[in-house]
Amino acid sequence: MTQLPQSLGELQAVFDHWTQSMQKIKGRNERIAFTRAEMPGLLLNRRLLKKIMTDIVKGKRYPDIRQATMFSNEFILYINNRRLYSVRLYIYEPGQYTPVHDHNSWGVYGCVSKKVEVIRYRRQDDETRQGYARLRESDRIMLRPGDTSVVRPLNDGIHQAGNPATGTCVMLSVYGTPIRRLYVNQYDPMRNRVSRLYPPRLRKKRLATQALETMGVIDL
C-alpha cells in the first residue's frame, strides 16, 4: 500500500474514500461508473495537483520517482494493498504520445491540464500469426480539464494517449484490478506489428536470460 505524507492528507482522504467504496462495489462496470463520477473532483483540484508536482520537482519521497513504471512519463500516486485499483499521473511534453498499446485492466483517464488526446483502435486480424496485428482506428476523443474517458482490458482497450498541442499536459489515470499477465502488447499500426512490453525489472531479467543463453548457459 502506498504511504502518503501527512502534508497530502487531503489526497489520502480521497483514496481512503475510494477504497471503502470500491470494496462494496463488485461489478466492473459499476466500479468504472463510480470512478468516472469521482474523478472530476480530483482532476479540477489544481492546488492539490500543483502540490504533488512541486514535490516531484523538489525530490520529495512522494511520489517516489525511483519506482519502476512501464512508461518514462508515469508517476505512481497510489496502489491499493488489495490491488483494487491504482492511481497514476502522466506528464506529456508537446507532441508526445504513448505507443499504441492495450491494458491488463479497466481504466479511467482524466485530463488535469491543457488537452489530452485518446485514439482508440480495433484489432482486425485473427491473432494466429505471431508478431502480426492489423489495427483500424475506431475513434478519437479530446479531453479537457475535468473530462474523463474509459479504457477496457486487452483487445477492447487498444489505444494511445498523448499531447496534441503546445505546452505540457497532465493526465491522471485510475486502473482496476489487473489480470495475471506480466506484459502489455504494444502495436505498430503502420507496419502491422505487435510486440510485448514488459515492466523495467522484468525486461532486464529477460535481457540477462537471453544473454546467458547466447553464452551457452542453459541451466538457470
Give each language-model segment a name.
Residues 160-165:
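Asparagine-centered strand-capping/turn motif at beta-strand->loop junctions
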Residues 122-158, 197-201:
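Short acidic-glycine-tyrosine-enriched beta hairpin
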Residues 187-220:
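Long hydrophobic alpha-helical segments typical of transmembrane helices together
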Residues 68-94:
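A short glycine-rich, His/Asp/Glu-containing loop-to-beta-strand
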Residues 108-110, 166-181:
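A short hydrophobic beta-strand segment most commonly corresponding to one strand
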Residues 1-57:
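N-terminal leader/capping segments at the start of a protein or of a new domain
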Residues 88-102, 152-156:
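Conserved short histidine dyad/triad with adjacent acidic residue
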Residues 105-124:
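Glycine- and acidic-residue-biased ligand/ion/polar-headgroup-sensing regions
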